[in-house]
Curated annotation (Swiss-Prot):
It comes from the Eukaryota. Belongs to the isocitrate lyase/PEP mutase superfamily. Isocitrate lyase family. Its main location: other. One of its GO terms (biological process) is glyoxylate cycle. It catalyses: D-threo-isocitrate = glyoxylate + succinate; (2S,3R)-3-hydroxybutane-1,2,3-tricarboxylate = pyruvate + succinate. It is found in: Glyoxysome. Substrate binds at S97, G98, W99, G207, H208, R243, N423, L424, S425, P426, S427, T457. SUPFAM superfamilies: Phosphoenolpyruvate/pyruvate domain. The keyword Magnesium applies. This is Isocitrate lyase. The gene is icl1. Gene3D superfamilies: 1.10.10.850, Phosphoenolpyruvate-binding domains (3.20.20.60). Keywords: Glyoxylate bypass, Glyoxysome, Lyase, Magnesium, Metal-binding, Peroxisome, Tricarboxylic acid cycle. The lineage of its organism: Eukaryota, Fungi, Dikarya, Ascomycota, Pezizomycotina. Its cofactor is Mg(2+).
């Protein structure tokens, strides 16, 4: 067999291996609009095993079990390795927040609010820092345990430091090739899963800010496909989480996808000029700031802005029809899921008139269409994303159980096996939202609805700020007493391993490596005679 035949045989062997991989139950709900042949053709000759693939498999196993049992894994945004090692004792996953990274860990070191305007390697870099710490502390612990006699080993901690990391991919930081490159970075740096949201990249906002602009459903599906394709090229089981910001969105970039049409807002006043024409005329007349805002406010007040379905319902109600309720039901049933042009034809057939409704007239100065979000809107998008996503997350304004149930029920009516995620956001005022008894059971109640993974995005930031404020305030007044009472004594009482920070940092582990290299003796061992950490021995 010649070189060309060998080359073809290897290619077809790889294709068959990919086809067999895709038959695994892991992919029973996953839709791929490409072939194994196309994926293998994009691979190089050197097969690389990515450690993150083991973590992805581990994460999937956790979430499969959670969904089956109707329980949840819950975690929070981790800032740095110290926090990571403490989380590993109690929580089975780790979250890496784009918000936290934007404010504390940009690769340019320039802090920013959560606008995803930091370089695209920022969050992957944070994942890498945490994953490297996981590997190190796992090695350190294993060395200590395996060199301890069996009869004493049970007294030692046995912490699973290798908790799967789920990270924030924002909107993908650009077009589809940018999404693929970002996905590649995350896989290389150790992420088990990533989430990506359906906002427009240039105007991305924190999920709890105003002014969110969506992309069409089809565009976000393309992003999800790009993530899966890149993971397939790299041979990994990376989890893709689809986030929708449509519950509170007010704008959308395009009307190209008919699945968005029912939620786009139009003007019902035929006597008005398009808003942008008036705004442009105002600018040319020298108006600025509040004067331009007044023009927009007046136009909106007169425009009769509403959804096309609402315009049809209002037309039927205002007409001379005898059976108005029946006609409304007939229209809404027939128009559900249809494009606007199809809905117009249905409406004319029922009402006998061409209803004036113009979605171009209210467009913003940036060209965006006005949009009316909400829970049903989010369900509409989630149902479309489900075949391409392992989990789905609806960003919401409040921790509202009834809304969470409405969303879960709406998605599961179409996709019963769809796993869901939930942001237990610190942007919510939890004290106002529900009593403490309900706070305590909220995660469990959501888990029963299928929210298999839940997370507090910024708990790492807030807990760090809280203890830093408490300690700095007390330290300024009480000096070292504050350190003893607020930090060291509680560390010792609660058995926090960082109290012996030299050992926590791996000094014993490194000493033993040096001794291995030098025949068992090292006069420069960091933990030798004279180390101050001996003060903490019992």
């Amino acid at each position: 067999m010649g070189f060309l035949e060998d080359e073809d045989q290897k290619y077809w062997d790889d294709v068959q291996a990919v086809k067999a991989w895709w038959k695994d139950s892991r992919w029973r709900y996953t839709k791929r609009p490409y072939t194994a042949e196309q994926i293998v053709a994009k691979r190089g000759n050197l097969k690389i095993h990515y450690p993150s693939n083991d973590q992805s498999k581990k994460l999937w196993k956790i979430l499969e079990s959670n969904f089956e049992k109707k329980v949840a894994s819950f975690t929070y945004g981790c800032l740095e390795p110290t926090m990571l090692t403490q989380m590993a004792k109690y929580l089975d996953t780790v979250y890496v927040s784009g918000w936290q990274s934007s404010s504390t860990a940009s690769s340019t070191d320039e802090p920013s609010p959560d606008l995803a305007d930091y370089p695209m390697n920022t969050v992957p870099n944070k994942v890498n820092q945490l994953f490297m710490a996981q590997l190190f502390h796992d090695r350190k612990q294993r060395e200590e345990r395996i060199t301890t006699p069996k009869d004493q080993r049970s007294k030692l901690p046995n912490i699973d430091y290798l908790r799967p990391i789920i990270a924030d991919a924002d909107t993908g930081h650009g077009g589809l090739t940018a999404v693929m490159k970002l996905t590649k970075l995350f896989i290389e740096r150790g992420a088990a899963g990533i989430h990506i949201e359906d906002q427009a990249p240039g105007t991305k906002k924190c999920g709890h800010m105003a002014g969110k602009v969506l992309v069409p459903i089809s565009e976000h599906i393309n992003r999800l496909v790009a993530i899966r394709a890149q993971a397939d090229i790299m041979g990994t089981d990376l989890l893709a989480i689809a986030r929708t910001d449509s519950e509170a969105a007010t704008l959308i970039t395009s009307t190209i996808d008919h699945r968005d049409h029912a939620f786009i807002v139009g003007s019902t006043n035929p006597n008005l000029q398009p808003l942008n024409d008036l705004m442009l005329a105002g600018e040319q007349a020298g108006k600025t700031g509040e004067e331009l805002q007044a023009i927009e406010d007046q136009w909106i007040a007169q425009a009769g802005l509403k959804l096309f379905d609402d315009a049809v319902v209002d037309t039927i109600k205002a007409g001379v029809h005898v059976n108005k309720d029946a006609l409304i039901k007939e229209y809404l049933t027939a128009a559900k899921g249809k494009s606007n042009s199809e809905a117009r034809a249905i409406a004319k057939g029922i009402t006998g008139v061409d209803i004036y409704w113009d979605w171009d007239a209210p467009r913003t100065r940036e060209g965006y269409y006005r949009y009316q979000g909400g829970t049903q809107c989010a369900i509409n998008r989630a149902v479309a994303y489900a075949p391409f996503a392992d989990l789905i997350w609806m960003e919401s304004k409040l921790p509202d159980y009834a809304q969470a149930k409405e969303f879960a029920d709406g998605v599961h009516a179409v996709w019963p096996e769809q796993k869901l995620a939930y942001n237990l956001s610190p942007s919510f005022n939890w004290k106002k939202a529900m009593p403490r008894e309900e706070q305590e059971t909220y995660i469990k109640r959501l888990g029963a609805l299928g929210y298999a993974w839940q997370f507090i995005t910024l708990a790492g930031l807030h807990t760090t700020a809280l203890i830093s404020d408490q300690f700095a305030r007390a330290y300024a007044k009480q000096g070292m007493r504050a350190y003893g009472e607020l930090v060291q004594e509680p560390e010792m009482e609660q058995g926090v391993d960082v109290v012996t920070h030299q050992k926590w940092s791996g000094a014993n582990y490194v000493d033993n490596m040096l001794k291995m290299l030098t025949g068992g003796v090292s006069s420069t061992a960091a933990m030798g005679k004279g180390v101050t950490e001996d003060q903490f021995k019992h």
